[in-house]
Amino acid sequence: MKTSVLAMAVGIGVMVAVPVLAADHVVPTAPKNYLDMKNPLKVNKDALERGGQVYERKCKKCHGANGDGKGEAAEKLTLKPASFVTPGYLKGRADGQLYFITEKGSPNTDMEAFGPGSETSLSKDDMWKVIAFIRKSYTK
């Protein structure tokens, strides 16, 4: 009986705490040297095609095929992935901020780091290409 009461209390505590923690999450900003960065690539058909391939392999499972944050893996996450299609979301983010998040990940979320030296280790070039693809495909 005591175990059941304890388990129920813990369960209620988790149900209350998770939304509160999620509400406190903010999209990470970036150090000034990143915020000042602009995408150095010439955005052309080839760059967008490669960015789309990277998005398909690395981003779609969480951010979704439509960039809405509703990928197949998103259901299992406490903090849902960013929806790139939310009006103003991408316009309010500097290229360097998106690069920083892609390279370093997002603290206290399941957004992993994709930069050189990470487990997935995308090249700088591929990170810029996927950012160009996201901007071109999902900016509202």
PLM regions and their residue ranges:
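Bacterial N-terminal signal peptides that target proteins for export
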Residues: 1-9
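Bacterial N-terminal signal peptides
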Residues: 9-17
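Axial heme c-ligation environment in periplasmic c-type cytochrome domains
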Residues: 22-23, 75, 82, 103-137
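Electrostatic cytochrome c docking/interface patches
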Residues: 24-54
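Periplasmic/extracellular electron-transfer cofactor-ligation site
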Residues: 31-35, 52, 56-79, 104-113, ...
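Sequence context surrounding c-type heme c attachment/ligation sites in exported
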Residues: 49-52, 56, 93, 97, ...
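Gly/Gly-Pro-rich "capping" loops immediately C-terminal to redox-active cysteine motifs
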Residues: 68-99, 123
